[in-house]
């Protein structure tokens, strides 16, 4: 299931997604209420640090979240089981049902990693290897979904 808004960037992405029976493309086609229901039906959330990630976390979904220079102490997803979020910036970390992937490229304005873009600029680069995300998702899926009776 792929979701997104109806802005130009998401609309362009929607055009690039192949038509396949196992891909449900809801980009630009869901209200917030509909997204809550779709998220509740999902097995996991894989995506950026967004409201959707926090919705999935509130529903105790397995989270694979991609962060840029965000201050994870403030914005990482809450683990209901642990009753906490993360407190450290690290390239890859897992706490209970949450795995975070964070870019380790320093902020061009202040040189910090995880400054949270406090300079009102959006000029950050990401150096997260997509393979590391795929590997973590595959490992979880094979251990928890495929092997379940």
Which stretches of residues belong to each language-model region?
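Nucleotide-sugar donor-binding patch of glycosyltransferase catalytic domains
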Residues: 25-26, 57-147
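Compositionally biased, intrinsically disordered low-complexity segments
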Residues: 20, 148-149
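Donor-binding and catalytic core of enzymes assembling or modifying cell-surface/extracellular glycoconjugates
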Residues: 1-73, 79
